[in-house]
Amino acid sequence: MVNNILNTAGGAVIYFTPPNDEDLLYVKASFEDENSIEREVIVSSVIDSLSIVGFAEEGTYPVDVIAVDRGENESIPTTINISPLEAPIHGILNSMVGNADFGGINIAYENPTRAEVSLNMSTLDSSGNLVFRESFYTSQANNSYSFRGYDPVSTVFVIYVEDKWGNQTETR
């Protein structure tokens, strides 16, 4: 049933040949992410690939591929292993360059996979506590964003990147 596995940034694409069954309704992939959260991806009977996404960390993860007919009868699972590449959030964080900007900071970044992420910025208050300030949501490939509205005093800015699955980078 499974023909090929293409590991991608934060996931994999599983190519398969659907069973030759007139009663086939869909094919699904069942798996746990690195936080042991059970997830499923379902595609219709006319699709020949499953796109697995949302992994924050590289590693080897088992995935069960299952065919389901109109009576909701499931095939015996075919278990394969995927090995997601580095998640986009890490590459985005590593590409960031911050520069002082009028009333704040400008963050330039690269997002070659056009991942849907948020850049989350915090500052340190006078007691040294981290205080969340704002988020910028983007899926643009290469861009910059200015976090503004701050007094013209020395300010420590702290930033991290988060994806739509709640995966977060360390702070910088």
Task: Please name every model-derived segment.
Residues 12, 17, 26-28, 41, ...:
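Generic alpha-helix signal with a bias toward terminal, lower-confidence helices
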Residues 93-172:
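Ser/Thr/Gly/Pro-rich, low-complexity flexible regions
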Residues 1-23, 57, 70-116, 165-172:
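Pro/Thr/Ser/Gly-rich low-complexity, intrinsically disordered linker/stalk tracts
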Residues 25, 48-82, 139-172:
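Beta-strand-rich modules
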Residues 6-8, 15-17, 30-32, 44, ...:
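A structural detector for beta-sheet-dominated domains
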Residues 5-6, 22-58, 120-153:
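Recognizes extended acidic, P/S/T-rich segments that occur
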